[in-house]
From Swiss-Prot:
UniProt organism field: Mycoplasma pneumoniae (strain ATCC 29342 / M129 / Subtype 1) (Mycoplasmoides pneumoniae)
Taxonomic lineage of the native organism: Bacteria, Bacillati, Mycoplasmatota, Mycoplasmoidales, Mycoplasmoidaceae
Classification via Gene3D superfamilies: 6.10.250.40
UniProt-recorded name of the protein: UPF0134 protein MPN_145
Family assignment from sequence similarity: Belongs to the UPF0134 family.
Transmembrane segments: none
Amino acid sequence: MSYSPSLKEIIAILQKYTSKNYQSNCKTRPDGKLELSLNGVFEEIVKTPGKTRYVTHKQLDQKLKDFKQDLMVELHDTFATKTDLKESEARINQKLEALIQIVMVQGEQIKVHGEQINKLTQAVEKQGEKIEAQGQQIQKVNETLNFVVESLGSIHKRLDSMEGRLDSMENRLDKLESK
């Protein structure tokens, strides 16, 4: 977007080249653009403050060229009219409503996901309780198996001692028979 001078800036440029304050008229045209007119500008441009003198065409052309160059503004964009602004406002409102709808839908989806997460959390807690109960059962079975192993170990010791006694009894019987 290019720079566009204000009315005050234009009057300041005019005062740079001239010595009096000009009466300005600023009107809004039907197409929405501004029309600016300044009374008495070109008569004063060729005069030096306090003195009146003749100027050549070349000097006049140069002064007018300098003056126009200072006033020259490149306009690549046109100024928006009220209808353009209203249309733009309507488009913005439509986009805003669409975004609000999207946010509302996403909010509902978040609520649904939150409920699903709560259900999954409850299911995981139940499974955790089941796993804990199974762990306790396994621990009880393990304790029972350890007790059985200890019992079998003591039975094995008894059987070993009984076997030793039986062997010694058998040896005695063999000695008695051999005599």
